[in-house]
Amino acid sequence: MKRVTGVNSRRVLRQAVRVSLKPVYKMYERILEEKVKEGRVPEHVGIIMDGNRRFARELGLEPWEGHRYGADKLEDVLEWCLDLGVKAVTVYALSTENLNRPKEELKRLFDLMEERFKALAESERIHRRKVAVRAVGRLHLLPTRVRRAIKKAERATKEYKDRFLNVAVAYGGRQEIIDAVREIAHDVKVGRLDPDEIDEGTFRKYVYVGDLPDPELIIRTSGEERLSNFLLWYSAYSELYFVDVYWPEFRKIDLLRAIREFQKRERRFGR
């Protein structure tokens, strides 16, 4: 028999514990879901989908295979969010810094993005729930084939106005602010905008998802506890929740715990 050691042994033990506790978790999940539905659910949830590569590494897989597991998980999590009454979900799929990863990994990532955006355009789930799909970021940095797939998904869902899936790709929070400032500077220069009238409301018109409420809750998986340049303009008063599981292993009970914790917090907005 092959001996399992190190990281893999811990993973096997963790999986064994989860299997043995599955009936208990299911019961707890039902109770927790009832409590969550009794309280106020955030309208907009941001998710930093972290840990795909580490998940793959622990399974002895290639990094891109971890990203595929992560893409599968997104469909489930979106469905859970919508079932709970969340109106908008913004997920961090690819940062501007991620564009510096090895060429082979990026190629696989772009292949996956092209495939999944095309699938979103025709997804029964997306159209049944009437979810508008949008990509936000410096999209010009993506290959043409990926941009075409994005446009296909956006066109196919553009009539939907009540629920949103925003996918942040080639995205950086600082870069978004810089892009907004450049556009504002241009409009001031050509006389379209009076600089004395610029306020937060004005600025919102120039950021990527300024038409939506700020995310009330931001969840990050994998155990890392930082925003990593995600939604910087919007997150001034967001509640942050960090969970110590890799994104492909994120469960409905983890989402319920995050929202339940959100409901328990007192949001004072600096007052």
Curated annotation (Swiss-Prot):
Question: What gene name is listed for this protein?
Answer: uppS
Please name the InterPro entries in this protein's record.
UPP_synth-like, UPP_synth-like_CS, UPP_synth-like_sf
Q: State the name under which the record lists this protein.
A: Tritrans,polycis-undecaprenyl-diphosphate synthase (geranylgeranyl-diphosphate specific)
Record's signal peptide:
none
Q: Source species, please?
A: Methanopyrus kandleri (strain AV19 / DSM 6324 / JCM 9639 / NBRC 100938)
Listed A to Z, the keywords are:
Magnesium, Metal-binding, Transferase
Cited function: Catalyzes the sequential condensation of isopentenyl diphosphate (IPP) with geranylgeranyl diphosphate (GGPP) to yield (2Z,6Z,10Z,14Z,18Z,22Z,26Z,30E,34E,38E)-undecaprenyl diphosphate (tritrans,heptacis-UPP). It is probably the precursor of glycosyl carrier lipids.
List the EC numbers from the record: 2.5.1.89
The first-level EC class reads: transferase
Subunit structure of this entry?
Answer: Homodimer.
Name what cofactor the protein needs: Mg(2+)
Q: Which residues form the active site?
A: 50, 98 (proton acceptor)
Which positions bind Mg(2+)? 50, 239
User: Which top-rank group of organisms is this from?
Assistant: Archaea
**GO BP terms in the entry:** polyprenol biosynthetic process
Where does the chain bind substrate? 51-55, 67, 95-97, 101, 220, 226-228
Q: Which reaction does it catalyse?
A: geranylgeranyl diphosphate + 7 isopentenyl diphosphate = tri-trans,hepta-cis-undecaprenyl diphosphate + 7 diphosphate
